[in-house]
Structures are given as structure tokens and as C-alpha cells.
């Protein structure tokens, strides 16, 4: 006889979601560094991908 599945708890959902987010973040960082190393531009800084948390420059106004 078929038995309904148990509901996944919120904490398990959150843990799995965070693991997925970490994997995607590190793949973005890796692809960005690879693209940066292979670029043949003459000193032009390419824009960083959205969500990249590298060093931020401070502007004084």
C-alpha cells in the first residue's frame, strides 16, 4: 500500500539550499578567475559578476 512521504523540515530545506548556493558561488568565482587569467585585454578591468564579494573600493565624496 502506498504511504505518503514525510514532510521535509524547514531546517533541512535551509541546509540543502545553503549548500546549493555555496556550490554556485564557488563556481562563479572559479569561472571569473579563469576568465580574468585568460583575458588578453590591455589593462581594462572587466566588470565583476553580480554577487561577487571581492574587495570593494571606497569613494570619498
Curated annotation (Swiss-Prot):
Pfam families: Ribosomal_L32p. Residues 37-61 are annotated as: Disordered. Keywords: Chloroplast, Plastid, Ribonucleoprotein, Ribosomal protein. It comes from Agrostis stolonifera (Creeping bentgrass). It is found in: Plastid, Chloroplast. One of its GO terms (molecular function) is structural constituent of ribosome. The keyword Chloroplast applies. GO terms for biological process: translation. Belongs to the bacterial ribosomal protein bL32 family. GO terms for cellular component: chloroplast; large ribosomal subunit. This is Large ribosomal subunit protein bL32c.
